[in-house]
Amino acid sequence: MKPENKIPVLTRLSDEMKAVVNFQQPGLPPWPADGDIETQRQYYLLERRFWNADAPSMTTRTCAVPTPYGDVTTRLYSPQPTSQATLYYLHGGGFILGNLDTHDRIMRLLARYTGCTVIGIDYSLSPQARYPQAIEETVAVCSYFSQHADEYSLNVEKIGFAGDSAGAMLALASALWLRDKHIRCGNLIAILLWYGLYGLQDSVSRRLFGGAWDGLTREDLDMYEKAYLRNDEDRESPWYCLFNNDLTRDVPPCFIASAEFDPLIDDSRLLHQTLQAHQQPCEYKMYPGTLHAFLHYSRMMTIADDALQDGARFFMARMKTPR
């Protein structure tokens, strides 16, 4: 699609979102567009420090969990001594960027709002690790904590997955993997999904939205996909194109959140409509005036905090619902 035909989203953003877009961190160099992937990862970590400041204080513990691919680092956030459930969090970053530190504030707020232990999983990044390694690492982490719950003072009778962007895909894919492979790590009561991609190759929103402001042009999305997948055939895998999986049965309750001007919004809409059509429990909420990745900006955007609290409320409601 000719770029000039796209919707001029920057003129339609909320005032809060505009403030974030126009915010300049003092001393922050420009994005290293020509840098190698490691340079870009270090920049992303540096740029996110401001947005992760002033987060709630709580007990944390780092644990290296053995998986078939080697140890994976996890971080446990415990807002209180006892917990009614355990929530596993998968960070976004296009499969190639991000770690536990870039999403620290998000996980702390989720732990605070749910009152539950949140476990962040520092899965291996692409292109060094290809599909389905991150999913298999996530499943291995869940299995480990299910078997060692007492050692970490965890309640794994009820568990959930949560994630943003690529992490949302990994969260839902991991849940479907557990179901399809008949692996039990606890009663999976809910999945919290913020502006994920779920397998569409093209859509109206991908044509109308996306640009330098969000790093989600068609070329960007192709780059993330090529870094993550092993080959073209993986595009149709039911744990990558999740619409090729069976979404008509036994899908845990899903909270599906989207950003109004996100090129990936149609992925969320289609997921919601598919689950709804087959009576799978779900809730969809679109946050007006926002761009992809707005969840990071709760220091300046009340709507980002609202989106986290909405997901937390959904999770807490499922904790009280027999399943």
From Swiss-Prot:
One of its GO terms (molecular function) is carboxylic ester hydrolase activity. The active site is at S165, D262, H292. One of its GO terms (cellular component) is cytoplasm. Pfam families: Abhydrolase_3. Its EC number is 3.1.1.-. SUPFAM superfamilies: alpha/beta-Hydrolases. Keywords: Cytoplasm, Hydrolase, Serine esterase. It is an enzyme of class 3 (hydrolase). Its main location: cytoplasm. It is found in: Cytoplasm. InterPro entries: AB_hydrolase_3, AB_hydrolase_fold, Acetyl_esterase, GDXG_lipolytic_enzyme, Lipase_GDXG_put_SER_AS. A motif (Involved in the stabilization of the negatively charged intermediate by the formation of the oxyanion hole) lies at residues 91-93. NCBIfam families: PRK10162.1. Displays esterase activity towards short chain fatty esters (acyl chain length of up to 8 carbons). Able to hydrolyze triacetylglycerol (triacetin) and tributyrylglycerol (tributyrin), but not trioleylglycerol (triolein) or cholesterol oleate. Negatively regulates MalT activity by antagonizing maltotriose binding. Inhibits MelA galactosidase activity. Belongs to the 'GDXG' lipolytic enzyme family. Homodimer. Interacts with MalT and MelA. This is Acetyl esterase. It comes from Salmonella choleraesuis (strain SC-B67).
